[in-house]
Amino acid sequence: MGDPKKPRKKWQGPSHPWRKETLLEEMQLVGEYGLRNKRELWIAKSLLREIRAKARKLLALPAEERIKLEKPLVSRLYKMGLLPSEDASLDDVLSLTVRDVLERRLQTIVYRKGLATTIRHARQLITHGHIAVNSRRVRSPGYLVSRDEENFISYYEGSPLAKMAQGGAQNV
């Protein structure tokens, strides 16, 4: 059954870790999205792999069963922010890339919203506790932000940066 103290790992590394093309692609993504190590990239790839596997299993089902089970998957991915509309098809699910998953990370969204000057600065703000989602402090840069939570990302109320953004504090 497994040891209850130790959680199952959420990632699977590449089957061929020393291929030049894979290494170059991974390093480019790690740099572009400010990831700390390749494990964070592999976690995103594993999530995408699971989603695509579910979509492929649905495609193998008969039409009436597929239609019934397709809607919950598509709506869940829409709420996660991975799909552009709730009317998306399984082909849209299968066309998702690892970049789509990495764009939903809190670190990336903080940078894209302009709360941080660089992607690495966004990571530092999050780990130091300056960023809140729904007025709740989140210290994990890898937190996947849902479509509903995206509008509620701001500086944490107790953070000196929040006071600076409001114009309250002069010397911080």
Swiss-Prot record:
The protein's assembly and partners: Part of the 30S ribosomal subunit. Contacts protein S5. The interaction surface between S4 and S5 is involved in control of translational fidelity.
Write down the species.
Answer: Thermofilum pendens (strain DSM 2475 / Hrk 5)
Q: Which CDD domains match?
A: S4
| InterPro entries associated with the record | Ribosomal_uS4 (IPR022801), Ribosomal_uS4_arc (IPR022802), Ribosomal_uS4_CS (IPR018079), Ribosomal_uS4_euk/arc (IPR005710), Ribosomal_uS4_N (IPR001912), S4_RNA-bd (IPR002942), S4_RNA-bd_sf (IPR036986)
Role summary: One of the primary rRNA binding proteins, it binds directly to 16S rRNA where it nucleates assembly of the body of the 30S subunit.
Q: What highest taxon heads this organism's lineage?
A: Archaea
Family indicated by similarity: Belongs to the universal ribosomal protein uS4 family.
- The protein depicted here goes by the name Small ribosomal subunit protein uS4
Q: Name one GO molecular function term.
A: rRNA binding
Q: Which GO terms describe its cellular component?
A: small ribosomal subunit
Gene behind this chain? Answer: rps4
Q: Name one Pfam family in it.
A: Ribosomal_S4
Instruction: Name the GO terms of the biological process aspect.
Output: ribosomal small subunit biogenesis; translation
The top of its lineage is: Archaea, Thermoproteota, Thermoprotei, Thermofilales, Thermofilaceae
**Record-linked NCBIfam families:** PRK04051.1, uS4_arch
Look up keyword Ribonucleoprotein and say if it applies: yes
- RNA-binding as a keyword? yes
- Record domain S4 RNA-binding: where: 104-168
